[in-house]
Regions:
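Catalytic machinery of carbohydrate-active enzymes
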Residues: 1-320
Length: 320
């Protein structure tokens, strides 16, 4: 049977969060599934080794209507692409009528979807979990799993000298905006304190847009034991992260990738809902000192109220 799963939330983090549900559906169907996902999910960069997924279709819809799937003409281009695949069943993690019509026009007979027109107020994780559990008829773990070739992990271990003499920490310096990014000087101070207790190496998770932050870390006393991901693809970085002991950083894509690779994670939430860190027991949430996990959300603006001591103590606890 050819099965399609449509997951249309934006971003890498959302893609990782939905993985456990996609895997559960593939296991129920006893076959790999195709996924239709947004381009900025970057699914093609970290899911190509996933045995539960046989095809990744990227939805190319852009706000300026220049994407090949934008508008009415783009809709029917996508219909044509899906028709060629001859899918027999589709699971739609979305309440939009657009995807119902897409499936019908693509001649997919068996359509299983969120209730239509019910998007407002949906809990992203609980809605997906309930939907999947009703399909498979049993409890589904929300812990995602990202597959990386063992040979690539072993190669990275040798190349970057992952010695047991050191603790290896993936550092999530990047974020989607300045209010969600803990100050770089606080990261440095925290890890200087940690390094007095444990010899550490640091793997700096950030891209070209984070070059100033990355350079400041590298120019610090920690620089000689640091590796930057600035010029690496996600695919190149994953085997390195797989060898790490811990993730410490902002609520960013690297947090969710690290979680999916099985790392214990310390996630700093200062201006976004902590619900995005509660789907996995691997994630340990730190919030501003004047907030709780329930009150921390959009517009908390608490980056200056997460102390070095908070992060130091939590890091020390998990490293021990």
């Amino acid at each position: 049977m050819k099965v399609l799963v449509i997951q249309q939330r934006m971003g890498i983090g959302d893609m990782v969060i939905f993985l456990s549900y996609i895997h559960a559906i593939a296991k129920k169907e006893n076959c790999p599934v195709s996924i239709l996902v947004k381009e900025n999910s970057r699914a093609d960069e970290f899911l190509k080794q996933d045995k539960h997924i046989d095809k990744i279709i990227l939805l190319d819809r852009k706000r300026n209507a220049m994407g090949k799937h934008s508008g009415i003409l783009g809709f029917f281009k996508l219909v044509k692409e899906l028709k060629k695949e001859k899918y027999e069943k589709v699971y739609i993690f979305n309440s939009s009528l657009r995807y119902t019509l897409l499936a019908k026009f693509a001649h997919i007979k068996n359509i299983i979807q969120y209730p239509l027109f019910k998007k407002r107020g949906q809990n992203v994780i609980q809605t997906a979990k309930k939907f999947t559990e009703e399909i498979v008829g049993k409890t589904v773990s929300s812990q995602p799993k990202i597959f990386v070739d063992e040979k690539m992990i072993s190669k990275a271990k040798t190349k970057y000298t992952f010695s047991k003499e050191f603790k290896h920490i993936c550092v999530g310096l990047s974020a989607s905006g300045p209010t969600k990014r803990w100050d770089i000087d606080r990261f440095i101070s925290t890890f200087e304190k940690i390094s007095k207790d444990h010899p550490c190496k640091f793997y700096l998770a950030g891209g070209v847009n984070d070059s100033i932050l990355l350079q400041k870390f590298i120019n610090s006393s920690l620089g000689k034991n640091s590796v930057s991901f600035e010029n690496m693809s996600i695919r190149e970085a994953l085997p390195i992260i797989s060898n790490c002991n811990l993730y410490v950083g902002n609520d960013t894509a690297w947090l969710h990738l690290s979680c999916g690779l099985g790392l214990k994670c310390i996630a700093l939430f200062m201006d976004s809902p902590t619900i995005y860190g509660k789907y996995s027991s691997n994630i340990n949430i730190v919030v501003p000192e004047n907030q709780t996990e329930e009150t921390t959300s959009h517009n908390t603006r608490g980056k200056d109220k997460i102390s070095i001591e908070q992060v130091f103590q939590k890091t020390k606890e998990l490293l021990n």
